[in-house]
Amino acid sequence: MARKDTNKQYSLRKLKTGTASVAVAVAVLGAGFANQTTVKANSKNPVPVKKEAKLSEAELHDKIKNLEEEKAELFEKLDKVEEEHKKVEEEHKKDHEKLEKKSEDVERHYLRQLDQEYKEQQERQKNLEELERQSQREVEKRYQEQLQKQQQLEKEKQISEASRKSLRRDLEASRAAKKDLEAEHQKLKEEKQISEASRKSLRRDLEASRAAKKDLEAEHQKLKEEKQISEASRQGLSRDLEASRAAKKDLEAEHQKLKEEKQISEASRQGLSRDLEASREAKKKVEADLAEANSKLQALEKLNKELEEGKKLSEKEKAELQAKLEAEAKALKEQLAKQAEELAKLKGNQTPNAKVAPQANRSRSAMTQQKRTLPSTGETANPFFTAAAATVMVSAGMLALKRKEEN
């Protein structure tokens, strides 16, 4: 209700203001016409008066026109106010309908709130009017202040221009320093990349060196073990060679005895049948010994060749072993040549000699009793082939083959 009364009062005030403006305009027009009439009556020179009247009439027409425009604007405002008033009434009606649905306490509270808002609105209106008056005073004051500020700004502008030039010089110097720093940074970055690549390369080289060191240590240990095996094999072979030489000497002595017995059997020519059998058996044994000696010789030559290809023996050891093997091979060749000659003689001198047969049997039994044993294995010595010699040769051959594969 309070809002509705307020809107009505506002509309009436606007209407009164518009009516008063029209009244003022009419009064001005009446005064203008009255002045025009007075001027015409009192003037002795009608022409100037007419000009003045025309000028006044034009001014009046302009004023009337302006007043009519203001009047039209006022009516438009009045229409707008009425429309707003209608809207407010509709809103108020809606609010009223809503309020009717609520309790009386809420309605009283709402009305009190509306009244409070109206009072606050009135207070704000007063404050606004006071603020307008203050604003006028402040406008004048600010104008003066603005003039002072303008002068101050001119001074500050000059100072700012000088400062701007100085800042520009500083900025250019800073940009140049920045470029130098960027170049230095890029250089340091490149040096860091080079250092990082070098560090990675050194690390790879170090790891490769460590791996190579481990491989060399393993190879060294392996070669050390192989050297020990080779040394043991060489010592065993040396002992077997010494035993073989001793057996060879015994065989030569026995062979000499057989030769003497053969001469005796050739002179006696008794026991042809038994001597012939003994001769054949001796022939078979000599042929078997010859074949065995050839096999031993080939094995020794092969071992000699493999030992020559070995890289882990010293030159002195190789020379000593080579000399021993060559001497042994030469002795075996001479022995084979002698046995071949004796075999040829046995083939050409097969004459009956019965009395000498027991002597031949005794000499063969003596040969059996005089066989020696090898010091390395304890086996019965054979001047041409032993199990220990075969083992040594096989071990040496395997060692040489393994070295070839590794190389």
Curated annotation (Swiss-Prot):
Keywords: Cell wall, Coiled coil, Peptidoglycan-anchor, Phagocytosis, Repeat, Secreted, Signal, Virulence
Biased composition regions of type Polar residues, renumbered to the chain: 360-380
Motif (LPXTG sorting signal): 374-378
Entries under InterPro entries matching the protein: LPXTG_anchor, M_anchor, M_repeat, SMCR, SMDRR, YSIRK_signal_dom
Region of interest (2 X 7 AA tandem repeats), residue spans: 81-94
Membrane topology: Peptidoglycan-anchor
Region (Disordered): 83-289, 344-382
Record's subcellular location: Secreted, Cell wall
Protein's UniProt name: M protein, serotype 2.1
